[in-house]
Amino acid sequence: RYFTYTHTNCNDLWEPYFGQLKKHSPPIEHTVIINKTSKEIPCDQIQYYDDKNYCQEYSWCLEQLEENYVIYMQEDFFLYHDVDTERLLEYLEILKSDDSLSFIRLINSGLVSDQKYEGHDSLFYVTPPDENHTLDTCFSMQPTIWKKQRLIDLYRECNRKTFGEDGFIEPMNKLGIKGLYHFENEFKRGMIHYDS
């Protein structure tokens, strides 16, 4: 299930975001969390409250889903190519079978290790499995397959009051959250992101 975070301030992005998803993605269940539900959004919606703690609201929204796995998304994650469904299912099976992993990021972003995940040429550890996270890029708001409960646990532990990526290092280390990222020598775009 896609799990998209958005805000009504970003409504100018909805048409291209949902349009590109429809064009390039297989039919995957989709829930959007938003500060105020909108008829412009063509899928299930859960309302969060701007004036409440961001992490608590986010984790509450996740708890409303039945699925055990979600694909973390935001309204500016535009698809430019068809989703590799077989690869997505392969990565989901890896998450299901490996208790040491909590997520697989579907893009190379940030400062990450170059240590390969055994038996997979396109998967690398965000941080080597025998090391603690030391960089804020260990958590990245990028397209990511998450074990839903681990994402809930992380947001509860981090407990940020506002939207953002800071403050996740200590909670990730405390909870033992480890993950992988996908990379197949895609072209670099900007300072830290790659095509994927």
Task: Label the predicted regions.
Residues 1-69:
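N-terminal anchoring/stem segment of glycosyltransferases
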Residues 14-19, 55-59, 84-93, 162-171:
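Well-ordered, non-membrane alpha-helical segments in soluble/globular domains
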Residues 135-196:
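Catalytic core and acceptor-binding pocket of nucleotide-sugar-dependent glycosyltransferases
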